[in-house]
Each structure stands twice: as structure tokens, then as C-alpha cells.
Amino acid sequence: MARILACGAFLKNAACLLDTHVPNAVQWSSQHGDLSDPRACIALEESVQQLLAQVGGPIDAIAHDLHPDFFSTHLALRLAYEHGVSAIAVQHHHAHIAAVLAEHSAHQGNPRPVIGIALDGVGLGTDGMAWGGEVLLVDGAHFERVGHLSPLTLPGGDVAAREPWRMAAAALHACGMAEQIVPRFAPTVGAQAARTIHTMLQRSLNCPQTTAAGRWFDAAAGLLGLSVRQEFEAQAAIALEQAAARYLQSHNLQVHDSDWAVTPNGQIDVRPLLLSTLITPDWHDPAAVDAAAARFHLTLADALSAHAIAQAHVHQVRDVALGGGCFFNRILTQRVVSQLEAAGLNVLQTKNLSCGDAGLALGQAWVALGIDSM
């Protein structure tokens, strides 16, 4: 029996209190928004104090994200010191999968290992790199990274997540086609901007890497001319999904496993898909763009599913949990679920909880509960 406070994610932040002493074990704060906004930070601190005031006894631990610079991490460390308890850092994608498990009673009290597919825009990995296209073996409070999407460069850092054309340029560079960056993007973003990004990629200047599925969606949307700069979060991914849906309403699509490869260390490489499908379509042919968007969705889903199935067999696991904001995408989710179920695996998804960052705190608390109980 324990009481765990979890401070939640950086984006779409919400905190929760997990109290296993009472039947209704989870109490949630309101959603505060993104912690880049000082008002959200103030709201989080107020909510946490309210949760602590409502608890029926002393807390046992405080969970937070692995990132050391988040306000939520600083708050957790301070509160842990004040209450004389442990502050427990939980990796972002581990927490996404744990949030799913926390909602499934079969995995409470006596958790069994699962394969987790965690897909989103960003989360700090244990290696210091930005993750987000992960296949994990999760065993309660512990996890092992058993696969991930091949990394893409973020030219300019975080700004690349707001400008899909930059991710498209990074994809061209990754495919050995950097010479196409300037002629392809100068007409839409200007020659100077296109040349600057080309130079940054060639020289690896301010070009961190990420395995995030969200950035692969951005790259695909940018390559197909569906999005240059985003006005709101996931705008490019939504446009890509809409294009795919238009095609799939009236067409069947055959996916080829030659459009991806898996390296011995579990890196899922979808560059063959870019070369065969996304780089060549005529932006001015809507039908070709829609077909390419559909092929991207189904191929990415099949590549991730195939590796998850292989890992489930290797580790003798029969459950696969899906977490992260990319699973708001219906085409991706339906395809992954159908592939996993066709292989005889049991698929776990969030039920009443958001699959995105708004539900992350429950996963943090669930992992911390396992660590605190050891």
C-alpha cells in the first residue's frame, strides 16, 4: 500500500495522486497546459498542493519526468525534500506504456512483461537523445529498449518540430539526396533559408537527432507538400492522415516489406519507403500525394508491428501495449492493432485515459509505485 504523487509531462501537463489505500485510487488535477507557460507552472504547483492536502496520510514518493530541466522535475525534487521522501525519475515512454498498464487490472498488483509501442513527438531517452518511436520490453518498474525508429536530424533543434519542411530536408539528407534540398524548398521558403538548412545538415551544425515518430510524420508531410510551417501542434500529421484517409476510402493498398529494414540492434529503418514513395510524387497531383500518404501510414504501422511481434516471440510475451500521442491517428492505430491481433497477440490501449501526455502522470505514478515497493 502506498501513496504516490506524480507531476506529469511537460506538454499538456496534469498531475495525479495514486493512493492504493482507497478504492478510488487515482485523483487527477485539472489540465494545466504546457509548462513553457509560467501560468501553467503556477497552476501545477497549486494543484499539487491541493492533492497533497486531500490525501489521507503521508505520501511515499514523488514521480517526475527524466528531464532534469523541467519545472515539474524541480517541483518534484523540492517537494520530495520537504516531505522527506524519494523523488523518482521515470522515462517518458516507459510512463506512456505504464499508463496503459495501470488502466488494465490484469497488470496491477502482479504485473507481467509486455511489449510496448510508444509513439509521440518527443521525450528524453536514457541515452540523452530525443526519443519517440520506441519498442520497449516493459516489466513493471523496469524497461528495456528493444527497438526504435531510425533517427532523423532536427536542423535547428526544436524549431524543426514546427517547420515540417526542415524535417523533409533532413529526410532527403538521410537518404543521400541533400542536393535536392535547395531546388525543392527554395520556391516555398526562400533560397537563403533552404541553403542555410542544407549547410547545417552537411556540417552537422545545431542538428540534434531524434527517433520520434512525430517527426517522421512531419517529414512525410513536408516531402509531399502538405505542410511547410505548422500553425498548431500536429497540423502536419493531421493533414497527412486526412490525405491518407481520402485515398483509403476508395482504394486498397498493398504494402511491401522491402520498404523498411531492421538492423541487428533493432533500428527500424524506413528510408526505403522515402526513396520508393515519398520523394518522387508530383506535389501538384492530389491523387499521387494521397496515395503516398496512405502508403506511409500503412508501411510505418507494419514496420513497427512486425518488430513488436518479433520481440514478443523472442521474450515470450503475449501482450502489446500502445501509448503516446501518435495513437490519436486512427489509420495508424487500426493498422497496428489489426497486425498485432492477426499475429495472436493481445493489444492493450488506454480506455478512459488520454493516450497522449495528458495521461502520462498515471504511468509515472505506476512505475514509481513499483520502485517504491521493491
Predicted regions and their residues:
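Conserved phosphate-binding catalytic cores of ATP/NTP-utilizing and phosphoryl-transfer enzymes
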Residues: 1-2, 89-116
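Short glycine-rich phosphate-binding loop at a beta-alpha junction
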Residues: 56-69, 315-326
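Short glycine-aspartate micro-motif
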Residues: 3-6, 63, 114-118, 210, ...
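Acidic, glycine/GT-rich loop-and beta-edge segments that sit at the periphery of enzyme/chaperone cores
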Residues: 180-184, 365-374
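A contiguous, well-structured pocket-lining segment that forms one wall/lid of small-molecule binding clefts
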Residues: 11-42, 46, 176-200, 204-317, ...
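Conserved phosphate-binding/catalytic loops in two-lobed NTP-binding clefts
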Residues: 65, 83-96, 319-323, 330, ...
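Glycine-rich phosphate-binding loop of actin/hexokinase-like ATP-binding domains
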Residues: 113-173, 194-247
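Short Gly/Thr/Asp-enriched flexible loops that form oxyanion-binding sites at enzyme active sites
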Residues: 68-83, 122, 126-138, 330-338
